[in-house]
């Protein structure tokens, strides 16, 4: 009985080996592999969002490489700010980035203030949704672009709608366009390790009596294909005297295929500056005993770095290498990978 079972297993092994050889011959080496052999089980790489709290909430230290990301929320909630900060972080690591501006509303001066190197940024302002997604597909397939932002899904207007009359009803056209594009894109995105971020807007479903009436544009395809979905909301204003200088922001990780979902991050977005990263470092540093807080004074390794949060934040801005050191200690304390990029990134921050 055992001999018969062994012979049967041997036949199966031979048949499997022949099938694998045939598949590799037809589709190339690595098209099928055992889990222990390969690249599949490699640790997921990440790029920082520019917000320490959000990097921690994402569980892997930032947005995953080689995946589709969706960031959605109401108007002026910080969606574009978050993507521009991610572009700046990717550029600090030596990556190439592209911004597909379907809304034709990119503020290049603001992008520069957030640390984006405009000389190295590829920008496209397409006329139709098809053109935008074809450009995105070509950039992904090139394998030479590390991060692509599409701003926004709502502005990806199908060609038939642009060429038609104003009152024409074309139901489901944009949803079909997104579904087809994502079917084409996902394989290439994974193979080339390109991160593609789609910014999306919120709409209200009519006649919803129970449950959440909010939905995102472009159908359901993006919800399924996205590895990470971030819901960003403005929760309050930051004032200096009577003047509003920024907004308090909450981001919820609604979907996460690379770490546990439903975590939240709270941070400040200052107008003209972006996320107050140094403020986050101080808050999380004191919370996890990396930075000592005594009264109004903040200290690190026994040395005082400032009286009051504003002074301590300014001190860390002037000493980026110290800010980086504290941030990495906070990341280690929370079990999140340290920042990549080393001295080059610290120099970029200083300049």
Curated annotation (Swiss-Prot):
It comes from the Bacteria. InterPro entries: AAA+_ATPase, DNA_recomb/repair_RecA, DNA_recomb/repair_RecA_CS, P-loop_NTPase, RecA-like_C, RecA-like_N, RecA_ATP-bd, RecA_C_sf. Induction: By methyl methanesulfonate. SMART domains: AAA. The keyword Amino-acid biosynthesis does not apply. The keyword DNA-binding applies. GO terms for biological process: DNA recombination; DNA repair; SOS response. ATP binds at residues 73-80. Keywords: ATP-binding, Cytoplasm, DNA damage, DNA recombination, DNA repair, DNA-binding, Nucleotide-binding, SOS response. Its main location: cytoplasm. It is found in: Cytoplasm. Pfam families: RecA (PF00154), RecA_C (PF21096). PROSITE patterns: RECA_1 (PS00321), RECA_2 (PS50162), RECA_3 (PS50163). One of its GO terms (molecular function) is ATP binding. GO terms for cellular component: cytosol. Can catalyze the hydrolysis of ATP in the presence of single-stranded DNA, the ATP-dependent uptake of single-stranded DNA by duplex DNA, and the ATP-dependent hybridization of homologous single-stranded DNAs. It interacts with LexA causing its activation and leading to its autocatalytic cleavage. Belongs to the RecA family. This is Protein RecA. The gene is recA.
């Amino acid at each position: 009985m055992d001999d018969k079972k062994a012979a049967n297993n041997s036949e199966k092994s031979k048949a499997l080996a022949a099938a694998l050889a045939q598949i590799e011959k037809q589709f190339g080496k690595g098209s099928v592999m055992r889990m222990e052999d390969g690249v599949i089980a490699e640790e997921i790489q990440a790029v920082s969002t520019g917000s320490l709290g959000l990097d921690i909430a994402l569980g892997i230290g930032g947005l995953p490489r080689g995946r589709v990301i969706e960031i959605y929320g109401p108007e002026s909630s910080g969606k574009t700010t978050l993507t521009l900060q991610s572009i700046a972080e990717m550029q600090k690591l030596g990556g190439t980035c592209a911004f597909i501006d379907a809304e034709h509303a990119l503020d290049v001066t603001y992008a520069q203030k957030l640390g984006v190197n405009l000389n190295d940024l590829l920008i496209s302002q397409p006329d139709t949704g098809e053109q935008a997604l074809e450009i995105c597909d070509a950039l992904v397939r090139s394998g030479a672009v590390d991060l692509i932002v599409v701003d926004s899904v709502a502005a990806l207007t199908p060609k038939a709608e642009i060429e038609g009359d104003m009152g024409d009803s074309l139901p489901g056209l944009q949803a079909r366009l997104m579904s087809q594009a994502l079917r084409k894109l996902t394989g290439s995105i994974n193979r080339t390790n390109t991160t593609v971020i789609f910014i999306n807007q919120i709409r209200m479903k009519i006649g919803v009596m129970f449950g959440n009436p909010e939905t995102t544009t472009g159908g359901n395809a993006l919800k399924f294909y996205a590895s990470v979905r971030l819901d960003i909301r403005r929760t309050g204003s930051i004032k200096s005297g009577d003047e509003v200088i920024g907004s308090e922001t909450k981001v919820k990780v609604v979907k996460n295929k690379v770490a546990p979902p439903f975590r939240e991050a709270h941070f400040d977005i200052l107008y003209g500056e972006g996320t107050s990263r140094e403020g986050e470092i101080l808050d999380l540093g004191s919370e996890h005993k990396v930075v000592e807080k005594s009264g109004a004074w903040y200290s690190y390794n026994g040395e005082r770095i400032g009286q009051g949060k504003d002074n301590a934040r300014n001190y860390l801005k002037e000493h980026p290498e110290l800010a980086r050191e504290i941030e990495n200690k906070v990341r280690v304390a929370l079990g999140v990978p340290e920042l990549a990029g080393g001295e080059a990134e610290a120099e970029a921050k200083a300049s």
